[in-house]
């Protein structure tokens, strides 16, 4: 489904996360990376997961932390599930990094009984 508008919002601001899906964008991207302090990353994952699981009129994506960080796996493990339409992966430097993330998402989907993709 093509979309014209994307709205990014920091995933650690409960009020913004609550309202962003009603702003009229075709897709919403909740940011877990640069906008979130290290100490807030676990709580942000939970907030974003809950927001993505609610009914909404648009696509819901998460911008996770880069594969070279210690946070990427935790982000994916927390978020791959119902309601997540896709992942925005920052700072990809090689095709192998993208293949690794694709493989990891596929494994999490299979473990959780979700359809691939």
Q: Which role does the model predict for each range below?
A:
Residues 1-117:
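Expand to "…catalyze enediolate/carbanion chemistry for C-C bond making/breaking, isomerization
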